[in-house]
Amino acid sequence: MIGVLDYGIGNIGSILNMLKKTGAEAVAVTTGESLSACGRLILPGVGAFDQGMALLNQSGMRGALDEAVASGKPVLGICLGMQMLGLRSEEGSSEGLGYIPFSMRRFRPDGHPELKVPHMGWDRVEIVQRGASLVQGLEQPARFYFIHSYYAVCEDTGDVLMECDYGVHFAAAVHRGNVWGVQFHPEKSHRFGLQLLTSFSRG
């Protein structure tokens, strides 16, 4: 069973619908107890970093999520959910979850007046960790739908799963151990997103 954390700031319905298309069993979880009962977890999120961290901490699920990660359960962060997996963000002052050591920086299109912020729309990604389970069966070149103003900079380049270029090379997806994060929206990315979520659901 895949648990999608519902803490008041995520695109829950669209993610559940896409997971249903993969054939996976998935439910929205709102308590630490229901979270702990799931074998895989998705942390969605849209909006501001500090608000996301505050709502997650207030939800009563933070401790159970920490325990799930420590126990080796697969966890996938999406969009803001991915950003929260890291250490910090220039967008706010809150500490992130700290599961993967990366920080979020704001796009600064200096010298690239044609690039608008936020980075929005379809874009190509390059797979860095080609042997990772999450990218198996993914059609190449892979394209995903983005909407974000901040990008991840990993302290260890070995944590970069996919890269994208938008005036700067950035980590479009990250991976360390049982924790995965994607900056794009797989639930809005048609066959590419369907394949990625299928791979996550089957491990």
Label each PLM-derived region with a short phrase:
Residues 141, 175-179:
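Beta-strand-turn-beta hairpins that frame and shape the catalytic cleft
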Residues 47-121:
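Cysteine-nucleophile active-site neighborhood
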Residues 168-175:
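Short, surface-exposed beta-strand/loop micro-motifs that present aromatic residues
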Residues 2-24, 186-187:
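N-terminal beta1-alpha1 ligand-phosphate binding loop
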Residues 182-203:
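Acyltransferase
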Residues 25, 40, 74-76, 143:
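Structural signature of beta-strand start/N-cap positions in the alpha/beta core
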Residues 87-166:
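Pocket-forming structural segment of enzyme catalytic cores
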Residues 26-37:
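Short acidic low-complexity segments
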